[in-house]
């Protein structure tokens, strides 16, 4: 069988630990035998990020702007332990945070639903899509440890050199910590429009939540920008589509989500979206069963898995022990990127291949063949647990039957 040809490369961002192992397996077993894969490759593994002073991360984001579609493997965000383990020059920022800051846009995450895996919340009947703002807040912060006796202030210098000062805290009797966050109105507006457009495209209600009662400037600005854009640009379109936009406080939103049946988009600020997408994914089944795509205002797409690097399994793998690691989210990152590349290039064969690969993956699980995390969740009678590689080989058997 002739391989499917590509005209434009996908930006490929390799990653760390067990997901890096899975990344290569997916390409070797499920993609390269069928597709003449063209990628612009960047190694975002922590070792190489350290060697390049994180320049490789910036380069990969700029390449994504150039080509329009990227696929990213999970990467390590270093902490103090990783500083020692990898002998890092400095504690590099989150690769995702850097890429999202350059591309702007919104991260949309939705569960991959399969028969046999019932949500932990039995009332959830339909997918809940998390729309996560991809710029700023704690992911682009500045923070310091502060010595006892210090005074911390916010200082803003305008373009004419005039300073505005606001006291944060006078530290008396104890050392402490401070953190500076920021966001920009243009990015918040892009986030709002992306959410409203996605709601119209998918004909789903849109919820948005912050803590504006406490954060009367920061969070309230998010609320105000959303409301202004909705009233001026989207209200009539939403009415015509029969869908609604709904704002509430973040704690009320969590309570409503738990009681709901799903079937809507939940727009969240950056940190809220990070946390809540994990909660939604786990409650629907597994973090390994979640799609994630960053959509920029200029129509650039970056697909990734919504989970981490699966460190515990990686250490088992290094010892030569067998692992049963769920590769579905990483696989769906690849299929998402291949499908979008096909759509943009008018390459129906490539898009169709991505569809068939996803269907083969779902059929494998619904046939009872799955990794350990899904095995404990599945209520199928004929289920069996397989190892990391065998799961991909089982998918390949079903894929071949459709090609």
What are these regions (language model features)?
Residues 6-25, 154-247:
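Glycine-rich phosphate/diphosphate-binding loop of Rossmann-like nucleotide-binding domains
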Residues 47-164, 177, 271, 275:
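N-terminal glycine-rich phosphate/adenylate-binding segment common to multiple enzyme folds
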Residues 49-62, 230, 234-263:
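A structured beta-alpha segment of the ubiquitous adenosine-cofactor-binding alpha/beta core
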Residues 134-135, 140-192, 199, 347, ...:
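Glycine-rich phosphate/pyrophosphate-binding loop and the adjoining helix
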Residues 257-356, 363-367:
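Glycine-rich phosphate/nucleotide-binding loop
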Residues 2-8, 18-23, 28-53, 61-64:
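N-terminal alpha-helical transmembrane segments of multi-pass membrane transport
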């Amino acid at each position: 069988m002739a391989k499917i040809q590509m005209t434009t490369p996908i930006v490929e961002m390799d990653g760390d630990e067990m997901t890096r192992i899975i990344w290569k397996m997916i390409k070797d077993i499920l993609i390269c035998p069928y597709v003449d894969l063209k990628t612009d490759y960047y190694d975002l593994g922590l070792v190489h990020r350290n060697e390049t002073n994180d320049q490789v991360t910036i380069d990969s984001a700029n390449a994504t702007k150039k080509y329009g579609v990227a696929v990213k493997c999970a990467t390590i965000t270093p902490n103090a332990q990783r500083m020692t383990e990898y002998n890092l020059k400095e504690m590099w920022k989150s690769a995702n945070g850097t890429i999202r800051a350059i591309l702007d846009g919104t991260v949309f995450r939705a569960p991959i639903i399969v028969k046999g895996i019932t949500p932990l919340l039995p009332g959830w009947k339909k997918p809940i899509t998390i729309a996560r703002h991809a710029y700023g807040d704690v992911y682009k912060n500045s923070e310091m440890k502060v010595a006892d006796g210090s005074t911390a202030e916010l200082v803003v210098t305008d373009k004419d050199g005039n300073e505005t000062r606001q006291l944060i805290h006078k530290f008396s009797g104890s050392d402490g910590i401070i953190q500076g966050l920021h966001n920009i109105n243009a990015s918040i507006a892009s986030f709002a429009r992306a959410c409203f457009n996605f709601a119209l495209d998918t004909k789903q209600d849109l919820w948005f939540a912050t803590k504006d009662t406490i954060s009367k400037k920061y969070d309230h600005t998010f609320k105000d920008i959303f409301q202004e854009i909705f009233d001026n640009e989207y209200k009539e379109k939403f009415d015509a589509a029969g869908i609604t936009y709904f704002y509430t406080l973040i704690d009320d939103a969590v309570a409503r989500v738990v009681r709901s049946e799903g079937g809507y988009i939940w727009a969240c600020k950056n940190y809220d979206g990070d946390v809540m997408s994990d909660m939604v994914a786990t409650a629907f089944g597994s973090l390994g069963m979640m799609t994630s795509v960053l959509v920029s205002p200029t129509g650039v797409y970056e697909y990734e898995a919504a989970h981490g690097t699966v460190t515990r399994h990686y250490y088992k793998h290094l010892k030569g022990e067998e692992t049963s690691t769920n590769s579905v989210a990483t696989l769906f990152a690849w299929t998402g990127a291949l499908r979008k590349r096909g759509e943009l290039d008018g390459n129906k064969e490539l898009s169709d291949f991505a569809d068939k690969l996803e269907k083969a993956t779902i059929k494998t699980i619904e046939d009872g063949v799955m990794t350990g995390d899904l095995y404990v969740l599945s209520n199928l009678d004929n289920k069996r647990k397989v190892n990391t590689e065998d799961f991909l080989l089982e998918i390949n058997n079903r894929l071949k039957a459709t090609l």
